[in-house]
Design a protein with these regions (language model features):
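Flexible, glycine-rich beta-alpha linker
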Residues: 31, 101-103, 126, 150-174, ...
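Conserved Rossmann-fold NAD(P)-dependent oxidoreductase catalytic core, especially the SDR/UDP-sugar
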Residues: 79-124
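N-terminal Rossmann NAD(P)H-binding glycine-rich loop of SDR-like oxidoreductase domains
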Residues: 3-21
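NAD(P)H-binding glycine-rich loop region in Rossmannoid oxidoreductase-like domains
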Residues: 32, 36-74, 87
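C-terminal substrate-binding subdomain of Rossmann-fold SDR/epimerase-dehydratase oxidoreductases
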Residues: 14, 20, 181-303
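Active-site Tyr-X1-5-Lys
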Residues: 80, 122-155, 174-185
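Conserved catalytic-site region of short-chain dehydrogenase/reductase
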Residues: 60, 95-111, 126-132, 144, ...
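Short-chain dehydrogenase/reductase
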Residues: 71, 75, 119, 123-135, ...
Length: 303
């Protein structure tokens, strides 16, 4: 495949920046919630393939406070990009879902076949439903137009070039930023919730490698989950961040704040059936790299 014809939406973000090839679009190039801008940039670039990473994302607080915005912006971005890709003759498209698309009340582990088996968790249902529609749109386009469009479902992605904003970033980068400020200001490190919820994290460079594999090799109707299938508590994540940052102060657990979904373990059997020898970055190594990147790039980091 001609890598010069690869286009990456959200190309300056967490996953997009980790992908080593292709033309990378950011929100400064086009507002993908607007059809005319989306169609215009795709006609201009004329890609053979698209890796669609662009999305409105955030942590628990943002998902609770901006439900309407999260739903509208993600519905529009995804619908516009996939339809414009079809009209512009894009041969292969990879779209990103999220594990939040899965039902809250479901038998674990999560598998690719369970996406639409019930309602998502109440804390982020607008975002989750918007992301579910990516799966529906891709299936419909495959059936009607015969397009080789696929979707992938990474667990909680983290790494360099993440959004480290404390109010609207995801949990791990927001915690890194909080810990950095606590260390620099000699204050307590305050963390929402009890620390008990369990999450699966995957390093952005691992996601990039897997996405490049999907671009060349994966053509199925059903999405594929990217996960290590290893759960870790938020409390243990905080411990790894504290160690990597060299923070020696007090961690203050704000148990009056919401924890979000308690756990959502996922199954990587499908991924392992294709790539049995894939080596994931251990989370202590990934967190250390992420902390080092944030400290070294504090002035330019998204925060």
């Amino acid at each position: 495949m001609d890598i010069q014809k690869l286009l990456i939406t959200g190309g300056t973000g967490l996953v997009g920046s980790a992908i080593s090839t292709g033309t990378k679009l950011s929100s400064q190039d086009a507002d993908l919630t607007i059809w005319e801008e989306t169609y215009g940039i795709l006609r201009q670039e004329s890609p053979d393939s698209i890796i669609h990473c662009a999305a409105r994302v955030g942590g628990v607080g943002s998902n609770i406070n901006y439900k309407g915005e999260f739903f509208f912006e993600n519905i529009m971005i995804n619908t516009n990009v996939i339809e414009a890709a079809r009209i512009c003759g894009v041969k292969k498209l990879i779209a990103f879902l999220s594990t939040c698309v899965f039902p809250d009340d479901i038998e674990y582990p999560l598998t690719e076949s369970k996406i639409h088996s019930g309602e998502p968790h109440s804390s982020n249902y607008p975002y989750a439903y918007a992301k579910r529609m990516v799966d529906i749109q891709i299936r419909a386009y495959r059936e009607q137009y015969g397009l080789n469009y696929v979707s992938v479902i990474p667990t909680n992605v983290y790494g360099p070039n993440d959004n480290f904003n404390i109010d609207n970033g995801h949990v791990l980068p927001a915690l890194i930023h909080k810990c950095y400020l606590a260390k620099n200001n000699n204050t307590d490190f305050s963390v929402w919730g009890s620390g008990k919820p369990l999450r699966e994290f995957i390093y952005s460079e691992d996601v990039a490698k897997l996405t490049e594999w999907v671009l060349d090799e994966y053509d199925e109707d059903e999405p594929i989950i990217f996960t290590t299938s290893e759960e870790i508590s938020i409390k243990d994540v905080v411990g790894l961040i504290v160690d990597a940052m060299g923070y020696e102060g007090k961690v203050n657990w704000q148990e009056d704040k919401p924890d979000g979904q308690y756990r959502k373990p996922s199954d990587n059997s499908k991924l392992k059936s294709y790539l049995p020898d894939f080596k994931f970055t251990p989370i202590d190594v990934g967190i250390k790299k992420s902390v080092e990147w944030f400290v070294e790039n504090y002035e330019k980091a998204r925060k």
